[in-house]
UniProtKB/Swiss-Prot annotation:
Keywords associated with the record: Cytoplasm, Methyltransferase, S-adenosyl-L-methionine, Transferase
Protein name: Protein-L-isoaspartate O-methyltransferase
Coiled coil (UniProt feature): none
GO BP term (any one): methylation
Protein family according to the UniProt entry: Belongs to the methyltransferase superfamily. L-isoaspartyl/D-aspartyl protein methyltransferase family.
Major subcellular location class: cytoplasm
Organism this protein belongs to: Chromohalobacter salexigens (strain ATCC BAA-138 / DSM 3043 / CIP 106854 / NCIMB 13768 / 1H11)
Localization annotation: Cytoplasm
Amino acid sequence: MHCRIPDTQDTHRLGGIGMTSQRTRNRLIRRLQANGIRDTRVLETMAREPRHLFVDEALAHRAYEDTALPLGHGQTLSQPWIVARMTELVLTARPRRVLEVGTGSGYQTLILARLVEAVWSIERIGALHQRAAARLAMLGADNVRLRHEDGGHGWPQAAPYDVILLTACASVLPPELLAQLADGGELIAPLEDDAGRQWLTRVRRCGITFERTRLERVRFVPLLEGVIQ
């Protein structure tokens, strides 16, 4: 498939310069392609959107490296390859309505918002929730609804969802989340096995049963309970 990578004359009202320039972003996109990311919608969206706005200014020069970056509060901004891969998996279900558990910086939320009809996203850490809300508002992501809450409870008022995406690793999936999947819907999550290894996993709802498929090894921060103001 051909992915249109923007040239350096393309403009973005929040584009960067130097290590945050379009040329630097395009280099990241080529690396993602080389590492197996194929969905052109994902690649073009990630080429366009300003990842450097989702980290502290001191780390902005590293925003287009294929690496995770710290957000504070024991959380990280996921490696771009992981964001791309998880977004690809979300899109295979052709969803209209997506629930994200773990807003974090809001970057994954933004990529989803550009590609699906509506996104609901929950964050348990108040400071991260507030920063993500400000960034997403600035970028015009008006199809996103945010909540400061324990993500393990989901967002039942807006259920059911075509896809639920967890951005932290669970050892046991909260039954409340599974109950909020539409029939035929999918949950994409890093799950821990009995040996402590993490696997990116697809869980598909078929009536009252849930089919699990392990995809690949990953490394995420743990899914925690409770709310931090």
